[in-house]
Amino acid sequence: MSDIKYNRVILKLSGEALAGEKGFGINPPVLKDVAKELKEVHELGVQIAIVVGGGNMWRGVTGAELGMERAQADYIGMLATIMNALSLQDALESLDVPTRVQTSIEMRQIAEPYIRRKAIRHLEKDRIVIFAGGTGSPYFSTDTTAALRAAEINADAILMGKNGVDGVYNADPNKDASAVKFDHLTHMDLIEKNLHVMDTTASSLSMDNHIPLVVFNLNTPGNIMKVVKGQEVGTTIEGD
């Protein structure tokens, strides 16, 4: 593993990334491609934990905007992340990759409850661990979950796989042709420039625990491998 920069990582996988161009639900070919890439990285000996979002199924903020109580809407979103986690687990295990799903909301019939020491032990036994259910509390995003779990398991970095976006820009590249991509930023840059890579709570948690972030395009084959090897892909965020 001499050519590996990050030996233990959290991959933040958005729900939208699993939907692909469909924009809603799960796109089976996309799910299969992600699983294949994870298998290749896993075979290098990299310890992988994954935090999945649920935006391809439901967004708590959207539910609240429609008049639903925010906490209730967020709980629905947590259930959406669990559906995505089980789908990803199935895709990985179809490729003979050992996995465990841990949920922040107990549902022992289908997944383990989140236990930090057990999660670390699974990683040490070369199992991919998929964290689902967010933090288990409303008002917290899955980005915050990624930062929290990364700190808890002592991850070397958070890999933020984006759907069709190859890094961090000073404006939305899909709307502004003059948008400029950043290769390197600090955590404080994210907060001061209001760059919307992750919410402020997640950014602060990552900064306080000195956890690097790498934002990259998940849709480009081989990018996860390039990131764990420390190659120049996307935008790297580190330092205060």
From Swiss-Prot:
Activity regulation details: Allosterically activated by GTP. Inhibited by UTP.
GO molecular function annotation: ATP binding; UMP kinase activity
Pfam families: AA_kinase
Classification via Gene3D superfamilies: Acetylglutamate kinase-like
Domain of life according to the entry: Bacteria
EC number: 2.7.4.22
Binding site for ATP: K12, L13, S14, G15, G55, R59, N163, Y169, D172
Reactions catalysed, as given in the entry: UMP + ATP = UDP + ADP
CDD domains, per the entry: AAK_UMPK-PyrH-Ec
SUPFAM superfamilies: Carbamate kinase-like (SSF53633)
Annotated region (Involved in allosteric activation by GTP), positions in chain: 20-25
Family according to the record: Belongs to the UMP kinase family.
Protein's job: Catalyzes the reversible phosphorylation of UMP to UDP.
UniProt-recorded name of the protein: Uridylate kinase
Organism, as annotated: Limosilactobacillus reuteri
Gene (name only): pyrH
